[in-house]
């Protein structure tokens, strides 16, 4: 998953995580431009709503392009089992969708995630990763610049582009809907 994410490989990501909206695909393409790789990936799991689903916290370090120090990070995934027994990431609960709410969520799963994230071991993990993250930013000016300036500026530009594209598509759809249908004269014999 993380190898594909760093490469912006939507085809591979889509085989692991579903659904991935068009906007999220675009965001992954943008973010992957700044990431060389993910390192030191560790998964922490608990059972989800049923025996075939899992709550997964993933700690990792992100190696950004042109930056020596890695940035500690923490991700969350809700993993389910397909009918054929293979696991997949239910991407409705991705950080992207949770932040942007492009797709509706199951309130039972959402509630379980909230409980999971407030459990003492998960809170401790979050605190540990946050401390390492703060220390890494304080120790490397290039890392701090990448995370606090470069990437936010790129995301701001991306959001503007997505909004402009959505507005253009809406205008075109409205204009198409407003076009009166003209009757074609029928030939008579």
Residue ranges and their predicted role:
Residues 1-13:
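Short helix-adjacent coil turns
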Residues 2-5, 47, 90-92, 140:
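Alpha-helix initiation/capping motif
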Residues 10-60, 64-72:
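Short solvent-exposed beta->alpha transition segments
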Residues 72-173, 183, 189:
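Short beta-strand edge/turn micro-motifs at domain boundaries
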């Amino acid at each position: 998953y993380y190898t594909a994410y760093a490469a912006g490989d939507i085809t591979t990501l889509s085989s692991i995580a579903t659904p991935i909206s068009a906007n999220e695909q675009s965001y992954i393409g943008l973010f992957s431009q700044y990431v060389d790789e993910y390192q030191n990936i560790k998964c922490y799991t608990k059972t989800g709503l049923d025996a075939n689903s899992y709550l997964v916290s993933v700690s990792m370090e992100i190696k950004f392009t042109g930056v020596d120090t890695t940035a500690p990070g923490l991700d969350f995934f809700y993993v389910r089992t397909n009918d054929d027994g293979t696991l997949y990431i239910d991407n409705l609960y991705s950080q992207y969708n949770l932040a942007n709410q492009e797709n509706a969520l199951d309130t039972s799963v959402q509630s379980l995630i909230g409980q999971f994230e407030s459990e003492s071991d998960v809170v401790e993990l979050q605190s540990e990763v946050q401390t390492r993250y703060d220390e890494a930013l304080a120790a490397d000016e290039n890392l701090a610049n990448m995370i606090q300036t470069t990437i936010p500026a790129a995301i701001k530009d991306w959001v503007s582009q997505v909004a402009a594209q959505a507005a253009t598509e809406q205008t075109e759809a409205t204009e198409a809907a407003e076009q009166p249908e003209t009757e074609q004269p029928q030939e008579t014999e």
